[in-house]
Amino acid sequence: MIQTGEEDEEKATSLEVEFASGNGVDDEEELRLQWATVERLPTFKRVTTALLARDEVSGKGRVIDVTRLEGAERRLLIEMLVKQIEDDNLRLLRKIRKRIDKVGIELPTVEVRFNNLSVEAECQVIHGKPIPTLWNTIKGLLSEFICSKKETKIGILKGVSGIVRPGRMTLLLGPPGCGKTTLLQALSGKFSDSVKVGGEVCYNGCSLSEFIPEKTSSYISQNDLHIPELSVRETLDFSACCQGIGSRMEIMKEISRMEKLQEIIPDPAVDAYMKATSVEGLKNNLQTDYILKILGLDICADTRVGDATRPGISGGEKRRLTTGELVVGPATTLFMDEISNGLDSSTTFQIVSCLQQLAHIAEATILISLLQPAPETFELFDDVILMGEGKIIYHAPRADICRFFEEFGFKCPERKGVADFLQEIMSKKDQEQYWCHRDKPYSYISVDSFINKFKESNLGLLLKEELSKPFNKSQTRKDGLCYKKYSLGKWEMLKACSRREFLLMKRNSFIYLFKSALLVFNALVTMTVFLQVGATTDSLHGNYLMGSLFTALFRLLADGLPELTLTISRLGVFCKQKDLYFYPAWAYAIPSIILKIPLSVLDSFIWTLLTYYVIGYSPEVKRFFLQFLILSTFNLSCVSMFRAIAAIFRTIIASTITGAISILVLSLFGGFVIPKSSMPAWLGWGFWLSPLSYAEIGLTANEFFSPRWSKVISSKTTAGEQMLDIRGLNFGRHSYWTAFGALVGFVLFFNALYVLALTYQNNPQRSRAIISHEKYSRPIEEDFKPCPKITSRAKTGKIILPFKPLTVTFQNVQYYIETPQGKTRQLLSDITGALKPGVLTSLMGVSGAGKTTLLDVLSGRKTRGIIKGEIKVGGYPKVQETFARVSGYCEQFDIHSPNITVEESLKYSAWLRLPYNIDSKTKNELVKEVLETVELDDIKDSVVGLPGISGLSIEQRKRLTIAVELVANPSIIFMDEPTTGLDARAAAIVMRAVKNVAETGRTVVCTIHQPSIDIFETFDELILMKNGGQLVYYGPPGQNSSKVIEYFESFSGLPKIQKNCNPATWILDITSKSAEEKLGIDFSQSYKDSTLYKQNKMVVEQLSSASLGSEALRFPSQFSQTAWVQLKACLWKQHYSYWRNPSHNITRIVFILLDSTLCGLLFWQKAEDINNQQDLISIFGSMYTLVVFPGMNNCAAVINFIAAERNVFYRERFARMYSSWAYSFSQVLIEVPYSLLQSLLCTIIVYPTIGYHMSVYKMFWSLYSIFCSLLIFNYSGMLMVALTPNIHMAVTLRSSFFSMLNLFAGFVIPKQKIPKWWIWMYYLSPTSWVLEGLLSSQYGDVDKEILVFGEKKRVSAFLEDYFGYKHESLAVVAFVLIAYPIIVATLFAFFMSKLSFQKK
């Protein structure tokens, strides 16, 4: 709580002369003399110069330049100012305010008014279930051309009005879906293009169009979006640098000038702090150190943020980082959305206390929405805005809110948090329990009734009167509002973004090294395949040289693919920071362009250096460098193209298919697959739009106009010119520089497109809401009918399935990890306790105490580190394989398959995890009961969706996570923060359900951060931990928490708990690190010395002994269901995941249609007229195009899909839901019908357009070959995901894989010419078998004579001599083509079962 009065003012003087020793006159004189040296400096120098504490060597205070503070100096200064956050932060702010007031300077303030504010969103009305299936999407696309879609509007905010005042803290409360987030976004000026906004929002009487609201205020989102490679400090430093200092420097100059005039000597430490935080553009800012301290992030300041696949900070720390990222800036108007998610109540209280101090002392304007504020936290607020159904019910002082509802007959119970009461009073199901007039009948009071009553009340009338008066602009400083978009100058913004980009490249250096290593491997293979093919200058070897040049270009084209996924992975953070005006798009784009140039140049140089002389190109050194120049420029254009595609399309699916289409178009029109002279005249323009064409022109001109190709063949035509004529690439000797200029133009064009897309392209929005016609047509009145009392067995837990009660005991558990510096860090220290059947245990502690770590160790989820100690289940050592069968784990982060419904998620869990002898009817009844218990039955048909994009809200996902585990009927349930992200009412519902589960005799343990009094006293036992993973208390809380209160109040010096204080908040507060230091108590050691510890140890030892007649936990099989049932269940889920993922499948269908159509047009009827070898090679090129490019696209699409589902797979595999083989083969089988559809479409389009021979036999061979090819590419993509830790590595591996398949397909260089030491790679390459099947089946039996390199030959003989294809070998080809998918699919299943890249 905030301290006031003289006592605090006396404490406030303790730091004033800390740089001097003693309190005598000499010290005062020394201070004056040292300050005089600062005062003599020019104004600019004076505001960046301060006095720091005396150093130990000279014994004197030091004059320092605050722009050059080292890390140690910054930490020393912050430690001196804010040693204990609870007291020192208030003291610091008061000193700053006192200094400002002393010279008579007024701080800028902002008042935010909103009047009749309305927000509406468009919603699509459909018939049937509102589920986006493949068929629904196709129907929707067709209906757009036939008739308009039926749409309606949903009101999110409905004419709300109010005032958020400076100097006051306002709390925003309301149930989920009431419009809190929308209100916060609207007030901060974040209007989405997809919504319609009415009414007005004003800051200090100015409308949002008159200034820059995004810079004046800060909206802190409930989504934690950060760059995982950066550390916490680096994230805050970058944010502080980009947000600038606002008006701090002007205020500092004014203060300095006035103090000099009035001869005032400020507190040196405060002066140093104010000056250091007023300097713009610093790489490392003192404000960062201050925010790290205030938010408790100093302990993880140098830890990388991390993500789902990379270790990093905890969820609570990420939430605080999101807050700190914006609070570190100069804005004092803060709109904060659910900032306490994942935080313990003590940490939340501390943070909100600091914000309250900022509001009261610095006159900041702060509006915060919280889900479950503890009573102590609730008391910190001055005003409350209570919302319901998109309307404001109450907007007035906090102190009057209980009295307002008492007028309606509703009273908050004595041991009930007011915030919890306010959230539940809106609920039709919970309102009656607060009715206090037992002598009068209760009837449901609607939201509108509350609103009307408030408007008629004195509070409502007062608010209306204030809103009717115009704001007096003359009362505030103009610099309270921001009129500049960007805080930094252009050069400073570019420097900041460049520093960050360079750092990220260093952090991702392994990806770049891996990419270069694969390039070296491809180059080594290529140069040995084409070994000295250029030694002979004839048409045949010239053709091989063309193939080697195409191979180089194709490899460097694919080399740009990883840039696409890397760019997309950063777009989320970029969009957030661009919207906040951290920097313009060009400042972000230029460093990412320029710093990648050396990588492209290096890769191209490596390729040229390794291959040029070994393959046998023209030996002149000049031509070596000219080839390198073209290759590096081409590679740059490709990287730039993929970067631009990512910036334009923004999503991984849309960008991937566009990238694949780009590769297809570039290759088809590039002049190698089909010569320009063979293209239809009306499509010839495509050749000039492809960078690959210019690269081909430049490379071939460089080679075939060289002296060794200058031998005249006939009619003054040289050998080189003849080769170029055959390929349609003869554009003269000077075409090299034309091609080079064109490639430079492409580089500039694509990079300009990238910058423009980042600048003007709208950010990805949440998917449009879909509502069923039935729900839309339902009368509105039905929503306001009071709910009947629920008497179903769902609320009483009547369905009890058989299970074995189990006790988990753990003694002296320790856990160690190795830090990046190679040191060992202990996270758990000698934890002893027991989890008992029928007992609901809470695991509590401040953020970072090790709660989740202990839960992970006990449940067996840790994949790294060293675990010591003894863990037993039922008196026997824990065996993870069997333990996983009887335990459930609710993760902190809600990981679910996005394309199945809520009810299907539960059915899937019950199907695979309940014993096989439980019939389907019972399972379905249990699913229904659990849905009702956690109140998900109303949305059971809703698709889960992707977090932040579509589907369920955060709190609905949390309830789904719990429901999925409850329906599995485990004996032991571990729950990691089951109430995080839920409002007070939803948390109460969930914990009521959990309590019911525990009362059936199951063992349940939950980590919990912000329990209300009701929830805290629901638990039967408490395990309390402190920082360092040490045990502080283990035992029952007692009636009304009496036992835990009695234990801690027995320590002398501890403050007694106040009346109506939440015991959970109190014990977390008194056992914090700062409280221990203040009291001089080590609660961990005190617990070990206590009688309670000895009693607990005896109990644990008794429970650790197996009872007579018992036996260790074992099952007849590893999984609950048979392998066949597992496969069926997984296939059922995969079916819905694919069917309801139209973007995944429509893009693949669209690509095959486009590829087939382009091939049909470019090779129109060419299969009927074969007269020479080039005609046949061109037809072979069409087959190559139909095999390689759709396969590449399918491979890319499946990589995205499998990578997205892998975290779900890890969760389900840990729960022993199924064998990895069952999951893998279900994934394999579901691809079959979709690949068959693609093959049919391709065959139907291509066969008649290209003019292949119309026979059932040959058509079947084409269909069969393409079908097997697609399966091979699909399963290869799955295998790449199984082999790599993240999608970036998988895409990099894909690029190398494509290059190898392209090289050994038999098209670029035929089988007969491949050196014997590489021929095994030809037979290993699936594309070679597919192409052999296609070409041999079509022409292997054709005896027509054609002209081959000047002589006549039968087609079948040419195929055998040139390509090595025999019609008689088709039986072998057929066998290999079906064997390949089976082998690759088996490898995928094997590696999915053996490899895990999840780090815990």
Curated annotation (Swiss-Prot):
GO terms for molecular function: ABC-type transporter activity; ATP binding; ATP hydrolysis activity; ATPase-coupled transmembrane transporter activity; efflux transmembrane transporter activity. The keyword Transmembrane applies. One of its GO terms (biological process) is abscisic acid-activated signaling pathway. ATP 1 binds at residues 174-181. It is found in: Cell membrane. Keywords: Abscisic acid signaling pathway, ATP-binding, Cell membrane, Glycoprotein, Membrane, Nucleotide-binding, Repeat, Transmembrane, Transmembrane helix, Transport. The chain crosses the membrane at residues 510-530, 553-573, 582-602, 628-648, 652-672, 679-699, 738-758, 1144-1164, 1179-1199, 1228-1248, 1263-1283, 1289-1309, 1317-1337, 1372-1392. Residues 492-704, 1125-1339 form the ABC transmembrane type-2 domain. Its main location: membrane. It holds the Pfam family PDR_assoc. One of its GO terms (cellular component) is plasma membrane. Disruption phenotype: Early seeds germination on imbibition without stratification, and reduced abscisic acid (ABA)-mediated inhibition of stratified seeds germination. Altered root exudation of phytochemicals, with increased phenolics (e.g. benzoic acid, salicylic acid, syringic acid, tartaric acid, lactic acid, alpha-linolenic acid, cyanidin, sinapoyl malate, valine and indole 3-acetic acid) and decreased sugars levels (e.g. ATP 2 binds at residues 845-852. Belongs to the ABC transporter superfamily. ABCG family. PDR (TC 3.A.1.205) subfamily. This is ABC transporter G family member 30. The gene is ABCG30.
